[in-house]
């Protein structure tokens, strides 16, 4: 089952994750019978990390930590500007004291195509932005900050 609570995410983006703590905990609690609950949200992930639920997995941090291990040239790709601060904060937390200065690529023009349901154009636009950025500068790792962005790997 894939579930997105857009109102919860919108409130967390506008008022901060702490403002939705109780509602997020309730939402996750309704899923406690599942074998695993996977959070793929950089905005809500740090909040979810604090919940004492053994089968709640927040994978953004793990993915970002893995990317940092590949080398100092990291590109963070986002397409929704409202996720920029949370994604960059998580990346900086994962970088720690390593000598890494990440680059953020914002594919803002792609997001309206996703909202319109045109995922093919959405994915192609992201893939093109990544190709252009990596043609100008090599990167050791490219982080796609949203799960909806994974298909460009096939483009």
Walk through the language-model features, giving the residues of each.
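Non-catalytic structural scaffold of enzyme domains
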Residues: 1-155
């Amino acid at each position: 089952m894939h579930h997105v609570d857009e109102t919860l995410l919108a409130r967390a983006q506008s008022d901060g994750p702490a403002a939705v703590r109780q509602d997020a905990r309730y939402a996750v609690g309704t899923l406690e019978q599942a074998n695993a609950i996977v959070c793929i949200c950089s905005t809500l992930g740090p909040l979810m990390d604090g919940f004492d639920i053994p089968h709640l997995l927040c994978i953004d941090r793990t993915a970002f930590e893995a990317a940092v291990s590949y080398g100092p040239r990291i590109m963070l790709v986002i397409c929704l500007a409202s996720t920029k601060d949370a994604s960059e904060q998580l990346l900086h937390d994962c970088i720690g004291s390593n000598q890494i200065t990440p680059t953020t690529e914002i594919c803002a023009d792609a997001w309206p195509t996703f909202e319109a349901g045109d995922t093919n154009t959405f994915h192609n636009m992201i893939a093109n932005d990544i190709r252009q950025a990596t043609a100008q500068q090599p990167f050791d790792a490219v982080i796609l900050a949203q799960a909806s962005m994974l298909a460009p790997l096939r483009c």
